[in-house]
A protein has these predicted regions:
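Cytosolic catalytic domains that perform sulfur/thiol-centered chemistry
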Residues: 1-171
């Protein structure tokens, strides 16, 4: 099981592994659909696209939430099931922004109890630099049963932060 960083070489060796899922998290805040279009042209073979606004965030409510609030757990579980992720699935996430968006999905899966998730070391730019295989084929994975096992202590509220702002025991 890989749970932090994973090399392009190791990922390349598992491209045909039915127990592995590759999730492309490329995204640009100022052009939300740009990277999804790029994904349609080229991505890791067998990858699924994760749109930050649609798949990895709940709708923004002006004055109430941040830009990308966490989705409801039931919605995330449904999305992960549709992506073919079960408790036995090794997931690899990547982006082209130094891991900024891939790490969001890495954290979400870990928060929901899925430890077999790793970030592609160097992301999409390194994959291309090493001339690894790419594809334009849209992969539709078999649905799996994702069961969330929430790690409640991984999430803090704004109130928690305010209440502990000056507490030297909380870092």
């Amino acid at each position: 099981m890989y749970s932090s960083l994973i090399s392009p070489k190791t990922v390349n060796e598992h491209l045909e592994d039915p127990n592995w899922r590759f999730i492309d998290c490329r995204y640009v805040l100022t052009e939300p659909d740009k990277k999804q279009k790029e994904f349609a042209e080229s991505h890791l073979p067998g990858a699924t696209y994760a749109h930050v606004n649609h798949d990895l965030a709940a709708p923004h409510i002006k004055g109430k939430t941040g830009r990308h609030p966490l989705p409801k757990i039931a919605e995330l579980s449904k999305t992960f099931s549709a992506w073919g992720i079960s408790s036995s699935t090794q997931v690899v996430v990547y982006d082209d922004a130094g891991g900024a968006y891939a790490v969001r999905l890495w954290w979400m899966l870990r928060w929901l109890g899925h430890d077999a998730i790793a970030v592609l070391n160097g992301g999409w730019p390194r994959w291309l630099k090493e001339k690894r295989p790419i594809s334009a084929e849209i992969f539709i994975p078999d649905t799996a049963e994702f069961k969330a096992s929430l790690r409640e202590h991984w999430l803090v509220t704004a109130e928690d932060v305010q209440n502990n702002f000056d507490n030297p025991e909380v870092r």
